[in-house]
C-alpha cells in the first residue's frame, strides 16, 4: 500500500499520464507533440503546470518557432503561477492570438470501499441510453431510482494506464451524495485494474471543486493551457 500511495502522489508522473490520455507526449524534455487525435482536444501552443510539490513546469508545441519559444521561456522565469499575463504579452508581440483554459486535476488517496448501491451498466443498456450518458467506454457506474438512472459516472477517456471521470446527476436528485458514490465506484474499478483515475475540472467550476472536496481527493497539479485562437 505504501508503494502504491507514493506513486499516486508523484505529480510529474501523473501530468505525463494525463497528457498521453489527451493524445500528447513529451519530447526533448520541454516539448510536446500530438501522437493521437482525441475528440475535443486541441494541441496546446504552451502548457504550464503548477505541481503539488510546488514546482512549475512548462511545455511547448514542438512546432513553435525557436525565437518564440525562447521569448516565452524567458518570460516564464519571473512568472508567479497562475498569473500568466507576461506570457500573453509575449504572444501579442509575436501577433499570436490565443485562448486560455485553466484546470485542476486530482487523484484518489486510496481505493474506495465497494458500494453495493451503485451498479455497473453497459453503455448500451436502455436505462443508460435514456439518461443520455453512454460515454466512450463500455462500463457506466450508476444509481437508479424508480427504475431509471439518476446519477452516473464513466470515463470520458481511458487507456491502459489511466482514465478521467465524467459525472452527471439529474437536477432533481442532486445534493443527496449520489455523485460522490458513483465517482467512487468508477474510481475503484480503475484502481482495482491497476489504472490511475483522474478527476479534473475547470477552476471556475465551483460545483466540481466542491465534489472533489467531498471525495477527499488529492490535488496533484493545476494546469493552464494556451491554444491558438
Predicted regions and their residues:
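Conserved beta-strand-loop-alpha-helix junction that forms the acyl-donor binding cleft
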Residues: 199-210, 218, 225-227
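A conserved beta-strand-loop-helix scaffold within acyl/acetyltransferase catalytic domains
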Residues: 133-139, 144-162, 167-170
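Conserved glycine-rich acetyl-CoA-binding loop
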Residues: 162, 167-181, 203-204
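N-terminal charged segments
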Residues: 1-98, 116, 121-135
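Conserved GNAT acetyl-CoA-binding A-motif
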Residues: 161, 190-202
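Conserved catalytic-core motifs of GNAT/GCN5-like acyltransferases
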Residues: 99-108, 218-229
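Conserved acetyl-CoA-binding loop-helix of GNAT-fold acetyltransferases
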Residues: 175-191, 210-214
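Active-site beta-strand termini and strand-to-loop segments that position acidic
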Residues: 51, 108, 144-146
Amino acid at each position: 500500500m505504501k508503494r502504491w500511495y507514493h506513486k499516486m502522489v508523484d505529480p510529474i508522473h501523473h501530468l505525463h499520464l494525463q497528457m498521453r490520455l489527451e493524445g500528447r507526449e513529451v519530447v526533448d524534455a520541454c516539448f510536446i507533440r500530438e501522437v493521437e487525435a482525441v475528440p475535443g482536444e486541441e494541441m496546446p501552443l504552451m502548457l504550464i503546470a503548477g505541481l503539488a510539490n510546488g514546482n512549475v513546469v512548462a511545455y511547448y508545441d514542438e512546432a513553435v518557432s525557436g525565437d518564440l519559444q525562447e521569448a516565452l521561456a524567458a518570460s516564464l522565469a519571473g512568472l508567479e503561477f497562475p498569473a500568466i499575463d507576461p506570457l500573453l504579452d509575449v504572444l501579442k508581440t509575436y501577433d499570436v492570438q490565443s485562448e486560455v483554459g485553466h484546470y485542476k486535476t486530482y487523484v484518489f488517496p486510496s481505493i474506495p470501499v465497494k458500494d453495493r448501491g451503485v451498479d455497473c451498466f453497459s453503455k448500451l443498456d436502455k436505462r443508460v441510453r435514456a439518461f443520455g450518458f453512454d460515454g466512450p467506454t463500455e462500463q457506466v457506474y450508476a444509481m437508479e431510482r424508480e427504475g431509471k438512472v439518476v446519477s452516473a459516472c464513466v470515463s470520458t477517456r481511458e487507456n491502459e494506464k489511466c482514465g478521467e471521470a465524467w459525472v452527471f446527476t439529474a437536477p432533481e436528485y442532486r445534493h443527496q451524495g449520489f455523485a460522490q458514490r458513483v465517482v467512487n465506484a468508477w474510481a475503484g474499478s480503475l484502481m482495482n485494474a491497476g489504472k490511475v483515475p483522474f478527476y479534473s475540472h475547470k477552476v471556475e467550476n465551483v460545483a466540481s471543486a466542491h465534489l472533489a472536496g467531498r471525495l477527499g481527493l488529492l490535488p496533484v497539479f493545476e494546469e493552464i493551457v494556451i491554444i491558438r485562437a
